[in-house]
């Protein structure tokens, strides 16, 4: 009677021992946890570099690189793969029973003790290439493979676990530093966001593209159109209830568009689209500031509906009318100013033209307000008082005075506009005589591309300028002097007859 026996018992002892070694032998593939640990440790060391990196990319696992690394690890060669192409590579070997991923990455990172970042050099007789590859900022993909080698070519010991990691894009470019020093994430590429001091790719790259500034167009129904200024002499006006504005295009009627622009641009002629059109861009202010432009500019725009004064137009000699006919303009100012500032926009090329038109070549019947060109821009906190350049003839109204502006690069806060003689403030556009009543205007700032930035503050009151008060007294003396000379003999004759 034969008893049953296991087939394992029938095997020769040497073969059975070999099968047991194969069954219980060390594993050669990295587990999912080991792969994640590999990526996490790389990113941890990359985020903690010293000095900090401004362009360090976040590293992620790549299966193709892992397969390439595994294929080379199976060759059991202690040396870099000469056929790796455009791939970086780090190697690690251990004679213990299993692979230790934290120990491998930690050994690579310890090489930073021998690396001089300022000179991008390694200490003599030391290795730094593993560390520089770990922290190479442009590298963002890693794939690793391990293999158990009974014999490792180039090493005397037996039974070694070999770890091979490949990187893309490769690091260790000769003559270059591993990363750019600076504030973390301050130089991330387009399409990347900041995560734990590393530049992480955005999930939706389309959102990373620079979108143009949002422009909100004002509907045509909100604009009040008027006939062309060339045909009727009255410029077209349009207002918007937007809080901020930056682009104003005028072609027979003004319309405002809202966008976060910061500069004021004006071409030399200030007329680019049609006979009566002009294109300007004004800065969006933090506080709502009504704008009043002097020459070819849009009227003031406020948060709510704005009421404008009736245009002031005083006839002038033919030479001035011909010059003014080239550009339609009118005097516009708010009836009641709620803000102490307004904007005076000037073009660098048109400033001499404004000054040339403002200089009186012939005596006029009305006094003129002169806007002199600043000879030199003063420093911040330096304000230069300038005398008026034009001599005004006799004023028909005792309230008419000459202008004495202040020149500065910064905005000069002043008192709000004052009303005198029951008349409202009026700002001249293109060199026409000013209105009989000239009140104190707030400060005005100018910002033009290709020109100069000026802050002008006009002082109109005679009490603030003693010279102007003396000018009024002298004029009154000149007027009454001849009459007193004629009346005195008559009075003496009458006294003798009596």
UniProtKB/Swiss-Prot annotation:
SMART domains: SCP. GO terms for biological process: negative regulation of cell growth involved in cardiac muscle cell development. Disulfide bonds: none annotated. Its main location: secreted. It comes from the Eukaryota. Induction: Up-regulated in a mouse model of heart failure. It is found in: Secreted. GO terms for molecular function: peptidase inhibitor activity. The keyword Ribosomal protein does not apply. Residues 39-167 form the SCP domain. Residues 383-397 have a biased composition (Basic and acidic residues). Keywords: Glycoprotein, Protease inhibitor, Secreted, Signal. Residues 1-29 form the signal peptide. Belongs to the CRISP family. May inhibit cardiomyocyte growth. Interacts with PSP94/MSMB. This is Peptidase inhibitor 16. The gene is Pi16.
